[in-house]
Amino acid sequence: TDKKMRFVPFFGSSEWLRFDSMHPAVLAEKYDRSYRPYFLGQRGAASFNQYFGMQQMSSELEGQTAVYVVSPQWFTKTGYDASAFQQYFNSDQLTAYLSQQQGDAAAQYAAQRLLQLYPDVAMAESVQKLSEGKKLSSFEERHIEMMAHLNERQDAFFSNFAALNNENYDQRILPYMADLPDTFSYQALEEIATAEAKKKTSNNQFGIDNQFYKTRLAGKVAKLRGFQTKQSYEKSPEYNDLQLVLDQFAKSKTNVIFIIPPVNSKWMEYTGLSPEMYQRTVAKIRYQLESQGFTNIADFSKDGDKPYFMQDTIHMGWNGWLAFDKAVDPFVANPQPAPNYQINDRFFTKEWSQYTGKPEEFK
């Protein structure tokens, strides 16, 4: 809410809720950095709903810096869950998308996917036209403009009644700040992170946070042995959804750093998740990014076996957050113009989402 503070969008999902003393919000606040992370995405978020969220803030993304966590776990065979998408989707996102769409491959794919995941969406006739590559009539455009204005007014009205919520700050950030040294030093922070993690991962063999293990895994861990043996992330509509996000970043000339997190390697071994398949997925994601000019990538996908790198089965914590900070802080603290992105609409196709060959041979 501070107008003078530079807020930087950090796009992701449930990793932002994995608080410990090395969490990006804690470090930014404790060491009074020149920016504050603005976390976007909750549990169950993925690229498709991030894309629609971006429609509401396209002017704020223009020429700015962003951080984007892209989790290989999103890339399941069936893709994004319709109920999760509908839970986060709202009418303001819809009118923002409809009023800003350019009738291009991105607009068409977004409309097709929207009808798949939300068949009863408002203004479905307009969405249907876009999905077929047709132009909207001037009547439809006026109607969308009117609805967008109404949504903005409603938003402004209700935001007057929203209490300034400092609960997250008081409960999740302040308590951790007290444990950190006043002078910033990665060496000192690593010692604190390791000591804290050691204490909090004592009740299981996976190096998972005690509380998470007790509440989420302890009662069913025996049943989960080998359950991911056949899991694959190589074929998924999520690759096409990711392309929407890349297209938006290119249009907004946003300079982005992408974070690829690992899986807890002990958990990976226990559940039978193939490390080779995971790396093939990462290679496919990286090719989609790098071949279009998105070359700022912090790839932690092979670090799931490092001590106290992971807080649970798939989320970073402690030393993982410090590795994240070493990559992200210099990038965000020293903003640079976006590179000249070369968007390739072939990444919207089913051929790409189902492709399992060498990524660089995809034509």
Spell out what each predicted region is.
Residues 1-16:
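Short extracytoplasmic
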Residues 5-7, 35-36, 62-65, 251-256, ...:
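Loop/turn elements at helix/coil->beta-strand transitions in domains of secreted/extracellular proteins
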Residues 12-13, 68-73, 213-220, 259-264, ...:
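Short loop/turn segments at strand-loop or loop-helix junctions that form parts
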Residues 14, 97-243, 345-363:
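Secreted/periplasmic serine-hydrolase-like ester/acetyl group-modifying domain
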Residues 16-107:
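Membrane-embedded segments
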Residues 29, 234-308:
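Extended hydrophobic/aromatic segments used for targeting, binding, or gating
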Residues 39-42, 276-277, 283-363:
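C-terminal regions of proteins
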Residues 63-85, 102-112, 127-135, 320-342:
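Extended, charge-rich low-complexity interaction segments
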